[in-house]
């Protein structure tokens, strides 16, 4: 299904916001030159700060997009981080009339400034499945060509899927317009300014925004997570065949294990021999609640490379790099990961590194919230749906260097509802969506990806990744039976008999009843859950008081 251009979408053009009208006018200016991905590559090579490595672009991708046969991976290196910060966001529809008028004027002024520069634009399709395709246009300056080039790499250039897109039924939603202007100057204190003025202007109702909001507007659940589908029908041992096809999804910020759980080839050798696996995506997808299916937005991965040394096999899938060191090795310019130059080095990688991948997959059997909360056992199952969604809506985690935050913020526990820092709409809409996921039969779990209280919040019992991967397999294969976690009604932990059969020593090691300094542990447990309750009480869930009450009451610690 395809989005609509403005003349199609607005039966009354007066319903269009001034923000979209300004964006549309710029987009349709004859002085804005349309470029394809090959032209964007050539422009990006000449951009200040961009270096060409001797690492070839993944050949299959280069061939598909008609890039030069000898195309190389470009490394776009920046100075201080001034973008990617929530403080820069201004939500047009959240402002009062006076503030809207001011912002409209400032936006017109910024676009006028922008038109003093040579401008380029490109079109892409967001969404990999014929039933979820949005057209998007990105407009920027020629001096920002690498940004546009990387955007085309991350999604699908429009011409690649033009025929399929044009043949699709129309969605009740507008095309997306994005505008970037790095040379913007403004000293108005209304806007964030750290070395340079920053404005991320969001008009979510008129699709001057990213794709997450589009999905929620048409009744889907937006997921900042990874999801894979396992087919047990191909297992060598026939006892697994009855499990059929099962999908499992993981939600967490960078560094919580989301990609490790999604992309691991065989869950550290714990999946039964002969299984078949496909991955939808390790970072972003939508759950179509009407058709009970999951759909991908992007054909590529935007990954951290801090754990990928020079000889890592993933480098062959590289398409573009950001903020990587480059060394001369055997006469060639070789990019180096492992955050050698600065933290949060990133790579755009072809989905081929996932092995078998798909554009849509089965509705999830299980959803897992990945928590950085030391008072939680390694795994809990939420049998109360309101507890399940409350834990997602008040997902507790730690900030990381993938985000533009101060150093002292990195170790603080924070709430990031459903692990989605890109949400620009009301929280209650995500809550409603995930309650619907629960009503459609999905099971919900919490994994502790930090470590479990041993003696204090600083002295923790480690939870190795292999242990968590083994637990994942146990969930998928119904190996666990459950008993109530006495501290939290509606939550369950594995029984001794079932968990010891697959992870000997687990029950005693992680038994909530045997935590050191037990009184302090209980005090901290109650405090963390009170923080969750306070967070939900202070959120826009107050617009849905009945739902808010049910979620908050589910978080009562005994």
What are these model-predicted stretches?
Residues 273-347:
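Conserved nucleotide-sensing/catalytic segment adjacent to the nucleotide-binding pocket
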Residues 2-203:
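Long, basic/Gly/Ser/Thr-rich N-terminal segments
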Residues 2-69, 329-558:
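Conserved NTP phosphate-binding and transfer environment spanning the P-loop NTPase/kinase superfamily
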